[in-house]
Amino acid sequence: TRMAQNGCDVTCYNRAGHHVSGAEYDKTIEYDGIRQKVVPTIEKKGLAAVSSSFFAALCSAFGRYDVVHIHAEGPAFFCWIPKLFGKRVISTIHGLDWAREKWKFGVGSKFIRQGEKNAVKYADEIIVLSKDVQKYFLETYGRETHFIPNGVNRPEVREAKLITDHFGLEKDSYILFLGRLVPEKGIRYLVEAFKNVKTDKKLVIAGGSSDTDSFMEELKELAKGDDRILFTGFVQGAMLDELYSNAYIYT
């Protein structure tokens, strides 16, 4: 959004289907100066990301853009398409996705790993979010990358209002975990450990799944019987600010 505020013409390609923030956002075509365009998507697990990434790469190749910025290793599989049409390509690697538990075996892992290799081969520049991943690319491929950690806005401190109305939470009454509910984040260990702690604090697990609905169900089954453990689902905006502002501790 700051690029748009500084005069850049920014377009974001998004997959079809309901917006993660809710169906009321489905028809939003502009956000803080950024145009959003929806690309065709095969609505089937394992194909939604692949198909939308392909069509986004194809559309960007034919668009009047100076730079095409591709995020994550899977979508980077198609970075050769805009490159073929003379676009300058930037790839941001958010992590070694092929090593994640949900992709560890089978075709998905191989596809994502090839996306990593394509980024190395075709991207003009690669951005990484951690020193460890930067070291990995240098040692594995001899490829220099740019280490740019994710930036955050300074959160606004808010009193507990929405979280009290929706979840019965008050200031310092809970421990907060916030993130995608995926196995490699170790959430099952957090739940198991918390169940053995004698405290009147609650454990709030805030976040949605990422093609990991079965893991979410596993977590809920693991938490069954302990009414101190609360799953909020995906949160954002004022609700998110309140969760941060009023947590006893968070991880």
PLM feature spans:
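A short helix/loop element that forms part of the nucleotide-sugar donor recognition site in Leloir-type
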Residues: 24-26, 157-169
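Nucleotide-sugar donor phosphate/pyrophosphate-binding loop at the beta->alpha transition
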Residues: 51, 88, 99-118, 158
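Membrane-proximal helix-turn-helix segments that form the acceptor-binding/catalytic region
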Residues: 58-61, 84, 107-126
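An aromatic- and histidine-rich active-site surface loop
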Residues: 47-61, 65-98
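Carbohydrate-associated surface elements
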Residues: 132, 151
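Conserved donor-binding/catalytic core segment of Leloir-type glycosyltransferases
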Residues: 127, 168-198, 203-204
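Nucleotide-activated donor-binding/catalytic signature segment of Leloir-type glycosyltransferases, i.e.
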Residues: 216-242
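Acidic donor-binding loop of glycosyltransferase active sites
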Residues: 124, 245-251
